[in-house]
Amino acid sequence: MMNPLIIKLGGVLLDSEEALERLFSALVNYRESHQRPLVIVHGGGCVVDELMKGLNLPVKKKNGLRVTPADQIDIITGALAGTANKTLLAWAKKHQIAAVGLFLGDGDSVKVTQLDEELGHVGLAQPGSPKLINSLLENGYLPVVSSIGVTDEGQLMNVNADQAATALAATLGADLILLSDVSGILDGKGQRIAEMTAAKAEQLIEQGIITDGMIVKVNAALDAARTLGRPVDIASWRYAEQLPALFNGMPMGTRILA
């Protein structure tokens, strides 16, 4: 089996029918013409934010990571492993793709520990066992994995989806594409940066050009590139016609170098 490609979905993609239609059409085209197995990893920040707003619960973030108190982890699990995951499975079904919905704890695919007590139920993801997902891929399934994990003590944890995708890529020896709302990392003039090294990222963070959630994304991509020993792409889902080329390894956004 060829080494898999993990496509991490994020941003408002899950909220946009047009975007999901474009993405799944591109996935169908890719799967028809390529043998390479695909895995989707997703968060669902926008789904969670909407739910929190509806329930009048505050959304707190620390260094770009969502603070998840004990009384909110069940709600967030429902939103990510439930609503967001099953929405993607429904789109797969609509496009005749045989998909399986998972969370990080299934088959111990990604090991999760608590990241920081101050963040509450927020997990640190580390590589786990490839057995379950490899067996699904060998049988032609598309695994769709939510970024909810579970500790060895049985505590549910909310994991940053970029970091979850990185850990799963390390588990499977997979290539990784982080799809988001932006077409890559932008410089101070709003121009896309084609390639990024750790030194350049540090410089842009110091200058305040890379901020908030993008810091988490860039650090996750740098961590992934280092861990995997291969480049990681950050790109946009907005340009559907470019997606098959992107899945083929053509750089379309910002390529993060190890």
UniProtKB/Swiss-Prot annotation:
Annotated compartments: Cytoplasm
GO terms, molecular function: acetylglutamate kinase activity; ATP binding
List of residues binding ATP: D181, V182, S183, G184, I185, L186, I209, I210, T211
GO terms for biological process, alphabetical: arginine biosynthetic process via ornithine; L-arginine biosynthetic process
Keywords: Amino-acid biosynthesis, Arginine biosynthesis, ATP-binding, Cytoplasm, Kinase, Nucleotide-binding, Transferase
Pathway: Amino-acid biosynthesis; L-arginine biosynthesis; N(2)-acetyl-L-ornithine from L-glutamate: step 2/4
Residue numbers binding substrate: G44, G45, R66, N158
Site label Transition state stabilizer, positions: K8, K217
Principal place of residence: cytoplasm
Top-level taxon: Bacteria
EC numbers on record: 2.7.2.8
GO CC annotation: cytoplasm
Catalyzed reactions: N-acetyl-L-glutamate + ATP = N-acetyl-L-glutamyl 5-phosphate + ADP
Subunit structure comment from the entry: Homodimer.
Family of this protein: Belongs to the acetylglutamate kinase family. ArgB subfamily.
HAMAP family, sorted: ArgB
Function recorded in the entry: Catalyzes the ATP-dependent phosphorylation of N-acetyl-L-glutamate.
Protein name: Acetylglutamate kinase
UniProt source species: Shigella flexneri
Lineage start: Bacteria, Pseudomonadati, Pseudomonadota, Gammaproteobacteria, Enterobacterales
